[in-house]
Amino acid sequence: MTDKTILERSLGLFNLEKVDRDIFSWTGKNVGYKRIFGGQVMAQTLIAAYKTIDVEHYAHSFHSYFLRPGNMDKSITFTVDRIRDGKSFTTRRVRAIQGGEAIFNCSISFKVKEKGLSHQAEMPNISGPDDLESESEMRKRIKNKIDKKFHSIWLREREIEMRQVEPIDYLNPCLLYTSPSPRDDEL
């Protein structure tokens, strides 16, 4: 599968059809998984909410609840409640419904871009992407540490290329931090 078809397949997960005012639908498209992963339905609810607001607003707060597992083979209906439409702030509540039951619920606040305080750490001096090993290169390099029955999953092409500045050895877990309880001596 080429990079283009992987990306096109992934982007297809986010094409929502307008059913009515504030109601959108996504037709299930199985891409090899039985269940819908959280990031997908979160992105879809955010897209549904964005379709009901002015473009000058951007999401600045997102609170959500995963209620039930979703099924990739079934369509999802997204209902958007317009809680508030203000000059600076807009609020939406979105429910993702599958088979008549909510699988995901969220509340999203949008804000107009305004000048304000900015708290940001200075960018550290790190290697550029071309100097780092890609995740696919790393997976190929250590595939012999993985049981062969998992090679197809381990080595499958990914939609997004990751390059870690400080690579983590996922196959050699270790405790990075621990501390005693403040009242450890009383236990």
Model-derived features with residue positions:
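Terminal targeting signals and extreme-terminal segments of soluble enzymes
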Residues: 1-179
